[in-house]
Amino acid sequence: MADRGSFGFAPRLDIKQLLSEAQHRWLRPAEICEILRNHQKFHIASEPPNRPPSGSLFLFDRKVLRYFRKDGHNWRKKKDGKTVKEAHEKLKVGSIDVLHCYYAHGEDNENFQRRCYWMLEQDLMHIVFVHYLEVKGNRMSTSGTKENHSNSLSGTGSVNVDSTATRSSILSPLCEDADSGDSRQASSSLQQNPEPQTVVPQIMHHQNASTINSYNTTSVLGNRDGWTSAHGNRVKGSNSQRSGDVPAWDASFENSLARYQNLPYNAPLTQTQPSTFGLIPMEGKTEKGSLLTSEHLRNPLQSQVNWQTPVQESVPLQKWPMDSHSGMTDATDLALFGQGAHENFGTFSSLLGSQDQQSSSFQAPFTNNEAAYIPKLGPEDLIYEASANQTLPLRKALLKKEDSLKKVDSFSRWVSKELGEMEDLQMQSSSGGIAWTSVECENAAAGSSLSPSLSEDQRFTMIDFWPKWTQTDSEVEVMVIGTFLLSPQEVTSYSWSCMFGEVEVPADILVDGVLCCHAPPHEVGRVPFYITCSDRFSCSEVREFDFLPGSTRKLNATDIYGANTIETSLHLRFENLLALRCSVQEHHIFENVGEKRRKISKIMLLKDEKEPPLPGTIEKDLTELEAKERLIREEFEDKLYLWLIHKVTEEGKGPNILDEDGQGVLHLAAALGYDWAIKPILAAGVSINFRDANGWSALHWAAFSGREDTVAVLVSLGADAGALADPSPEHPLGKTAADLAYGNGHRGISGFLAESSLTSYLEKLTVDAKENSSADSSGAKAVLTVAERTATPMSYGDVPETLSMKDSLTAVLNATQAADRLHQVFRMQSFQRKQLSELGGDNKFDISDELAVSFAAAKTKKSGHSSGAVHAAAVQIQKKYRGWKKRKEFLLIRQRIVKIQAHVRGHQVRKQYRAIIWSVGLLEKIILRWRRKGSGLRGFKRDTISKPTEPVCPAPQEDDYDFLKEGRKQTEERLQKALTRVKSMAQYPEARAQYRRLLTVVEGFRENEASSSSALKNNTEEAANYNEEDDLIDIDSLLDDDTFMSLAFE
């Protein structure tokens, strides 16, 4: 069927008719979009209603009226008993999300529901559309229908229906009520009415494939072998199969119904126009009974919309009078028609047997093009239908080929494309789920087809998959993330597969809810994609997978980097590392599921943000080398993302593995300049300062190779610019990334990293953990980190050399201030350590060093405050002895005092001389001569006596502070060297230009991250505002709910 959106036809919505239909059905997403986009033409309620009845429609402004949900009704609550239990989902028009939908169920009457809609567009999201509706009945079960039919027809030749049966109508050839998300409730509603009614058999045509509502998970498309009945004589049908009109019957059929006209019937029901409480068109905005057309309404999603709307003209119905205002059939004629139809089912069925001869008269009211869309009738197409309003609206517009509003999901579009020429597409459903039977077509071999089928029970919920397209000859690996609806034992017992159109390929489970498979080679086109249990029956939602024309072009690294270069070697090593994979054991599938799923979601989110262009979309202004680099990047990007997802699910080191030469994927990506690979690798759990076998980080490799963009990205993401590589005999103190860059001639990168190390080190250091000193606060303001630095903006008349000179001089100033403040911090730390030693080096009170340093700092600060009087006295003394005479007297007195002290000390020492000589003589006589029989101290010759072996003395106890002192000296040397690197950068024009390019890249990266974070913050705040009174979808309530909305609104 033709797609209206593709031909640009303006959808025409009869607002009066739409408000009338809102009394007994939910509005479709497209209809709601039209109302919300044109809310100026309606009255917006300023206060919440008080217990509005079923069928009420309201428009609210959330900015004006916040608590529009306080309507007086008693809604079903959550477990806390306070918050209303609302489920949420996003509705689609075509394949694009356009609406938020929050729906609640009544506590006292579970059939009474409320739905709140608002647009996803930022400009219209404050307008809320609220719809109240009471849905009659419960879920219909088709079990036993055939049995009831056989029992009802076996006893007598005709079926007797008493006066309490439900009045119904005849459906049109096409399904009308494929509404928004309530297909389950609408299709299974059992309408009851206390008034006496009659029963009319409902004609149910085969539908064209494009009209199939694939998301109607419980739609009863007929027990095509008989009648569907329940509750005694009340016959109930599929509310979702109501249609607007019936074509004029042929002469033989009219003759068979003629004798029903004179039969007695109950009093006809009055035809009243339902009131739409709350939603009132504004005067002067729309005329009474006018249609909302494209002249004064905007057409939402003009190029994407795939739904059908009635055309302006209508087909005249010769035998069915219509009410000109409401579009409803005359109740008397319906009653006359329906009163005796049940009794003459045999006659009616016999007439259907001759449909081939009567097809020309049956299709008379239609044009040639329209007649092609009218399927043939069969006896199995008869079902009963009951109407909640006792008469079903027969809208004339639904006789057109573009009449019914169809669900355009992935499977329907595929069926429309692949099976558009086939007539007998039979689809049925049961209480257990959807069952798509095999397509019986003339072209199918042996009467069967390999078309996709849906299983009766769903075992897997598909959330997302990637990639969504590939080229025809590329066997790309596809990742599917979702949720298993089975227990872990059942998950491992099944053999899972993925269906690509008619080809089924095996799938592996990486972690609970994550599957991977390989897309097979396929011809160009769009095919359905879903999960199976290796039985070709779908156990998940049906999505779409595109096979695009073209072939995968394989490029080698030698085509870009040359034959014998370092880049070629690194590229080959990178490719070999991505080929290393391990299989996941079954007992590891359900371990750490939350953490693994979180990492996989981050990786797939980054991939969606960086979705590469489709084949053939490479810009024309790229050189041949750049085009080849683009192709290699696309190829390696897919491999890297898939490898990371696999490594996240593996046990052990995961993505932190090293190759044979001791480098990891992060180091190789940095060395090759693949800055696009940094963020996904970090999302997989690899540290940004992860070291290789030689102690080199990714920043070391990027600086060594001169990758400017990669260096800027790594520093912006928090890489440590002052990290040291492992010591070596040539460099016993290790080397920083700035040293490596300087050694290879990249002076701009060296100066940039040296400045970054100085500023980041100053930012990390704190003198006191308890208080922020003035030096720290002033340093944070005077010294700008790399994240705060911006390149000098270009103004009129500036030349690049001048701008780079300004940036380099600013860098020298910034680095000098940072180095000076670091020296001040070190001096302050040394002074506090001395105060700690004075406080008690033996640490008698078992206090920690940090606390002792704090005490020392506090003591120093307090002593400064309390020494004011002493300082004043000292000043007075200095004033008194400021004259030359007093000062001379003071110096003489001090000199005399020093001499007296020296004499006293000398006298005290000399007094001990005799005692010392006597003690030494006694020691020499008794021990050295008599005891040891030696010569004593007489005749002692040091050269002639061999020097005895000195005993090994125990190493003196080392103080931790000595080690810190040595480390601080080395740090000061490195800081001085870093400052020298920055000053050296400012002396060379090439280095200054390179430094400015780095600043520009960092500034651009910072702006992109800020925009992304602000968008994420806005979405988070928006979700928080919604969830203040709303709640996300509740699985338990949906499983118990008969009217839950389908999640597939593509």
Curated annotation (Swiss-Prot):
Gene3D superfamilies registered for this protein in UniProt: 1.20.5.190, Ankyrin repeat-containing domain (1.25.40.20), Immunoglobulins (2.60.40.10)
Claim: Nucleotide-binding is one of the keywords in the record: no
Protein location: Nucleus
Example GO biological process: positive regulation of DNA-templated transcription
Segments for region (Calmodulin-binding): 918-940
Organ and tissue specificity: Expressed in roots, stems, old leaves, petals, sepals, top of carpels, stigmas, stamen filaments, anthers and siliques, but not in pollen.
Polar residues composition-biased segments: 141-171, 183-196
InterPro entries according to UniProt: Ankyrin_rpt, Ankyrin_rpt-contain_sf, CG-1_dom, Ig-like_fold, Ig_E-set, IQ_motif_EF-hand-BS, P-loop_NTPase
Ranges where the record places region Disordered: 141-196, 223-246
Source organism superkingdom: Eukaryota
Record's GO cellular component terms: nucleus
Annotated S-S bridges: none
Keywords recorded for this protein, A-Z: Activator, ANK repeat, Calcium, Calmodulin-binding, Coiled coil, DNA-binding, Nucleus, Phosphoprotein, Repeat, Stress response, Transcription, Transcription regulation
CDD domains: IQCD
ANK repeats: 661-690, 694-723
Coiled coil, from the record: 957-985
Record-given protein name: Calmodulin-binding transcription activator 2
Gene of this entry: CAMTA2
